[in-house]
Amino acid sequence: MLRDLFVKKKKYAAIPSEQVRKDVPDGVMTKCPKCKKIMYTKEVLKNLKVCVNCGYHHPMNAWERLDSILDEGSFREYDKEMVSLNPLEFPDYEEKLESDRKKTDLNEAVVTGEGTIDDMLVVVAVMDSRFRMGSMGSVVGEKIARAVEKAYDLQVPFIIFTASGGARMQEGILSLMQMAKTSVALKKHSNAGGLFISVMTHPTTGGVSASFASLGDYNLAEPGALIGFAGRRVIEQTVREKLPEDFQTAEFLLEHGQLDAVVHRDDMRESLRKILEVHQGGEMAVWQS
């Protein structure tokens, strides 16, 4: 009997019953994919969807993003009814589009419009990775190009928040040509003295990273964002070298001169406000007709 006192007993983990799981409504708790901490969802939302334990930036949808940076009630949306078709008759593409529309309550992977930041008018575009992984098809490219042209007409800055897996394969070359179309629109805006701020969020990859996302007068990013063209494995197989652990992160790009700043979500609105304030009455006043 005494000998049993010094024997290490096996530890058992209690597994919640199915009834216990059902007692916690869906969406009440959120698990951080980085530190694995489980938190109340309302606590994460209150903190702009940033983990209160490790600072991981959870993805934001387009409306959450707009609410976090624009003055309350100032946003006016552009081209809301524009939707993608299936010009290449790609199998199941229309069904997938319809599924994403129902799931996200969006017509496409980008929301564009105008609003104010501390009463300064801007045209803004926000990509939403919930819709076809934020991929760029004809409508995404067209909406962004139109938004840039609107910024040109209004003589105001253009700001974009990117989150994308790249060009949309279901639209083939029609998708790839959006890289050129958006870049040309931005060049016109730039030549006229227009300010363009690009904010890259997780993930910004493929044709989006290789076109408009990297063309900002200011290129910013959120902490830990994955930014790059090809995938890590493809690059390693091509160069036959092991890449650094932090390769293609926002911090790696900042260290190597490809970003101007990595900005915490808490500081994003204020950082944008300061940039806009610097350019008020400066180069923005020297518009060419």
From Swiss-Prot:
Residues 28-289 form the CoA carboxyltransferase N-terminal domain. Its cofactor is Zn(2+). Zn(2+) binds at C32, C35, C51, C54. Keywords: ATP-binding, Cytoplasm, Fatty acid biosynthesis, Fatty acid metabolism, Lipid biosynthesis, Lipid metabolism, Metal-binding, Nucleotide-binding, Transferase, Zinc, Zinc-finger. InterPro entries: AcCoA_carboxyl_beta, Acetyl_CoA_COase_Trfase_b_su, ClpP/crotonase-like_dom_sf, COA_CT_N, Znf-ACC. A zinc finger (C4-type) spans 32-54. Acetyl-CoA carboxylase is a heterohexamer composed of biotin carboxyl carrier protein (AccB), biotin carboxylase (AccC) and two subunits each of ACCase subunit alpha (AccA) and ACCase subunit beta (AccD). Component of the acetyl coenzyme A carboxylase (ACC) complex. Biotin carboxylase (BC) catalyzes the carboxylation of biotin on its carrier protein (BCCP) and then the CO(2) group is transferred by the transcarboxylase to acetyl-CoA to form malonyl-CoA. This is Acetyl-coenzyme A carboxylase carboxyl transferase subunit beta. It comes from Bacillus cereus (strain ZK / E33L). The gene is accD.
